[in-house]
């Protein structure tokens, strides 16, 4: 898992542009909710964290990393679509590993 998270962080969470393009796509949210329900997770999160989790799932990165960060830091809900914030997420993922 550590290697997966580090690789993901080094890529500076490159899904940024893709998640912006998907911003108004109800199918993304529906698909995420189905995945979340099948794994027993609640989907009561902001769009940003939903997109982040969605991409982590599709890249086979352990969801527990972001879930821990979300619960302990309670910071992800206020993230904005900026590279600076995305880099902070990447650094936090590396720290968790």
Placement of each model-derived feature along the sequence:
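Extended, charge-rich alpha-helical interface modules
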Residues: 2-97
């Amino acid at each position: 898992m550590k290697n997966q998270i580090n690789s993901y962080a080094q890529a500076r969470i490159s899904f940024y542009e893709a998640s912006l393009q998907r911003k108004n796509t109800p199918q993304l949210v529906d698909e995420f909710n189905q995945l979340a329900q099948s794994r027993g997770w609640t989907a009561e999160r902001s769009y940003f964290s939903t997109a982040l989790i969605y991409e982590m799932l599709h890249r086979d990165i352990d969801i527990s990393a972001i879930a821990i960060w979300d619960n302990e830091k309670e910071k992800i809900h206020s993230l904005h679509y900026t590279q600076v914030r995305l880099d902070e997420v990447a650094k936090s993922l590396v720290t968790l590993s």
